[in-house]
Swiss-Prot record:
CDD domains: bS6_chloro_cyano
Positions with biased composition (Low complexity): 109-119
Pfam families, A to Z: Ribosomal_S6
Protein's gene: rpsF
Function description: Binds together with bS18 to 16S ribosomal RNA.
Region ranges (Disordered): 97-119
Cross-referenced InterPro entries: Ribosomal_bS6 (IPR000529), Ribosomal_bS6_sf (IPR035980), Ribosomal_S6_plastid/chlpt (IPR020814), Transl_elong_EF1B/ribsomal_bS6 (IPR014717)
Source species: Crocosphaera subtropica (strain ATCC 51142 / BH68) (Cyanothece sp. (strain ATCC 51142))
Keywords linked to the UniProt accession: Ribonucleoprotein, Ribosomal protein, RNA-binding, rRNA-binding
Name of the protein in question: Small ribosomal subunit protein bS6
SUPFAM superfamilies: Ribosomal protein S6
GO biological process per UniProt: translation
Family according to the record: Belongs to the bacterial ribosomal protein bS6 family.
Length: 119
């Protein structure tokens, strides 16, 4: 049964743009070869880490959203763990994802209510 997954991983900050694109392409290729569908990639860019990892204070954040059965998750994480370009990774299984719902939430303006009223 196919599930929706979200993976965020942090690449080393000293990688060039070409090396970042090669690393992302390598992981995308792995997923597509293993029958993952609806692969969406967002490269967030270099950001400050909450705490130092491997004596580095910055990292390049990348997000994958994809649909697959669970058999791709462990091999992909193993591949990232053994590679030297990934500092951290996290994969979560999403309960239910609907692109229409996500778009509606983004397009609806926040309702503002007065916090305090004059007495």
């Amino acid at each position: 049964m196919s599930q929706h997954y979200e993976m965020i991983f942090i690449l080393r900050p000293d990688l060039s743009e070409e090396q970042v694109n090669q690393a992302v392409a390598k992981y995308q290729e792995f997923l597509t070869e293993n029958n993952a569908t609806d692969l969406q990639t967002k490269i967030w860019g270099k950001r400050r880490l909450a705490y130092p990892i491997q004596k580095k204070v910055d990292g390049i954040y990348v997000q994958f959203n994809y649909q697959a059965d669970g058999s791709q998750v462990a091999p992909l994480e193993r591949m990232m763990r053994l590679g030297e370009d990934v500092m951290r990774y996290l994969t979560i299984k999403l309960d239910h994802v609907s692109s229409e719902t996500a778009e509606e939430e983004e397009s609806e303006p926040a309702q503002s209510e007065p916090v305090a009223s004059e007495a």
